[in-house]
Structures are given as structure tokens and as C-alpha cells.
């Protein structure tokens, strides 16, 4: 059963497009297209895992261009009875970065008693199309004090991103248009009901320890714990359907009966 069943991704929560950008043809605006990715899914089987996640699934990229990860919506569901103890910390990671504190883009903590949760991350930075084809993002998951036999799946996570795809940097930059970003370090959101152990160790330290134990390339195999359909992002050579210079593609997202929060980063 898909976790993401209804509602819509609200692009305006992440991007503030001017009226001029909506009217002008794409050749006169730095925005080539604004779109939402398809849903990528991770089934968590281990208490601590570092998994590949395709945040640009279904996004049409431009050859020799750029893609800005403007926003990310993460939905999680516990596959557990209501009275279970313990909790989880989820962290978005840029695997290109060598320093663990710079690799962590946003962290979120919640208890197993929350059957369903949802949070938003605002990475707000661009990478080249060439880097994007290498799937540079990972998810670090740390489950604590959830007593389940090995081989079963206590937690499911789904990811949908809002992206801006464009060809050149020479025109006025896009990043000052991104909303919900403020100065300061990455924010880590914590539910009051989460056990104290969740707040003791920052996720950047957990990532550094995990990398030192397993090696940076030792991540969860895609075929075992993540979705089977992990195709590379598609390249777009200029034939996307535009609406006044922008293309909009939306996925459905759950938006009722769930716990929703925002995690922010200071990347500019």
C-alpha cells in the first residue's frame, strides 16, 4: 500500500515565483522548469542503515545544466502496533561531502508511537546534471529501542522532492527566490515524546561513526531494502511542455491525519 495517497505537493511552500517568471518564455527566464519528482521508497530492515535514495526520480534533466533541490517532503509510517516504544532519527545526507557535519542536510526525530509522520527539508542548493546522474543523496536511519525480530520491516519511508531544472547560471540566480530558509546551522527537530537517547548524539556524529565503521561506499543495496524501480533521472534536451516558461509536474502527498514539520538547512 502506498503511503502517499492524496493531497498535493504545494510548490509555493518552497519556491516564490514572480509573475514575470510565470509569463515569460523559458528563453527569457532563468527557470527552465519546476517539477516534483516521482515517489522513491525505502523499506527499513536494520536498526542503523545508510541507504541510497533517488530524489530526482522521474525528473527530466538538461544536458550540461543544473538542478536545484528546492525542497523535500518525507513521509514515514511505522509498521508496528500502536503501543510500541522506541523511536527513529532520519537524516538526509549528501554523500559527496567528506566532513560529516557538512554532509548532513537535515535531521528529524520521532517516536514509534507516532504511526505516521511527515516532515519537510529545504536543502536549497544546486548540483550539475552530471553529478545528479550519480544519485548523490543518501538517507541515514537510526532506530533505537524497537524490539522486532531480524528480517522484518518496522518502518517505511517515502520521498518526493521539488526541483528547479535550468541550463545556465549566467542570469539572475534562483536561490534568492527560495522561501523558508534562514541563517544559522541545520535544524534538528525533536518530538517531546522521544526518548532522551535520541537527543544525546547529533546526526552528524552518527554519520561520521557509521562511515568509519563501514566505509563510505558501504550502503544498503538497492535491491534489498529500497525500491526496485531506481532508474536514473531522465535527461531533457529542451522538449518539455512549458506553461509560460515553466513546467509543473506534481505528485500526490498525504496531508491529513499525519504529523508534519519542517527541517531546514543553511546551504546557499
Swiss-Prot record:
Lineage: Viruses, Riboviria, Orthornavirae, Kitrinoviricota, Alsuviricetes
InterPro entries: TMV_movement (IPR001022), Viral_movement (IPR028919)
Organism for this UniProt entry: Tobacco mosaic virus (strain Rakkyo) (TMV-R)
Record function comment: Transports viral genome to neighboring plant cells directly through plasmosdesmata, without any budding. The movement protein allows efficient cell to cell propagation, by bypassing the host cell wall barrier. Forms a ribonucleoprotein complex with viral RNA. Binds microtubules and modulates microtubule stability. Can bind double-stranded DNA. Triggers host hypersensitive defense reaction in incompatible plants harboring resistance (R) proteins.
Keyword RNA-binding: yes
Subunit structure, interactors included: Binds to host RBCS at the plasmodesmata; this interaction seems required for viral systemic movement. In resistant plants, interacts with host MBP2C at host microtubules; this interaction prevents virus cell to cell movement. In resistant plants, interacts with host resistance (R) protein (e.g. tomato ToMV resistance protein TM-2(2), AC Q71BG9) at the host plasma membrane; this interaction triggers host defense responses leading to programmed cell death.
The protein's name: Movement protein
Domain of life: Viruses
One Pfam family matching this protein: MP
Swiss-Prot/TrEMBL keywords: Host cell junction, Host cytoplasm, Host cytoskeleton, Host-virus interaction, RNA-binding, Transport, Viral movement protein
Amino acid at each position: 500500500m502506498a503511503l502517499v495517497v492524496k493531497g498535493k505537493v504545494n510548490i509555493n511552500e518552497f519556491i516564490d515565483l514572480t509573475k514575470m517568471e510565470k509569463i515569460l518564455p523559458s528563453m527569457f527566464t532563468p527557470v527552465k522548469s519546476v517539477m516534483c519528482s516521482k515517489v522513491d521508497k525505502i523499506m527499513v530492515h536494520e536498526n542503523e542503515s545508510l541507504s541510497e535514495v533517488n530524489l530526482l526520480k522521474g525528473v527530466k534533466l538538461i544536458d550540461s545544466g543544473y538542478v536545484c533541490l528546492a525542497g523535500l517532503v518525507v513521509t514515514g509510517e511505522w509498521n508496528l502496533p500502536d503501543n510500541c516504544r522506541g523511536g527513529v532519527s532520519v537524516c538526509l545526507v549528501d554523500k559527496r561531502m567528506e566532513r560529516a557535519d557538512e554532509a548532513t542536510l537535515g535531521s528529524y526525530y520521532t517516536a514509534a508511537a507516532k504511526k505516521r509522520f511527515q516532515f519537510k527539508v529545504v536543502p536549497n542548493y544546486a548540483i550539475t546534471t552530471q553529478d545528479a546522474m550519480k544519485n548523490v543523496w543518501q538517507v541515514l536511519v537510526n532506530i533505537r529501542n524497537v524490539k522486532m525480530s531480524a528480517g522484518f520491516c518496522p518502518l517505511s519511508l517515502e520521498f518526493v522532492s521539488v526541483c528547479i531544472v535550468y541550463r545556465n547560471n549566467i542570469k539572475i540566480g534562483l536561490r534568492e527566490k527560495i522561501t523558508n530558509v534562514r541563517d544559522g546551522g541545520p535544524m534538528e527537530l525533536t518530538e517531546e515524546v522521544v526518548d532522551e537517547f535520541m537527543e544525546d548524539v547529533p546526526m552528524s556524529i552518527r554519520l561520521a561513526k557509521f562511515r568509519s565503521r563501514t566505509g563510505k561506499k558501504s550502503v544498503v543495496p538497492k535491491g534489498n531494502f529500497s525500491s526496485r524501480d531506481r532508474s536514473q533521472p531522465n535527461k531533457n534536451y529542451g522538449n518539455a511542455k512549458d506553461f509560460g516558461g515553466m513546467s509543473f509536474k506534481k505528485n500526490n502527498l498525504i496531508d491529513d491525519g499525519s504529523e508534519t514539520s519542517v527541517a531546514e538547512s543553511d546551504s546557499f
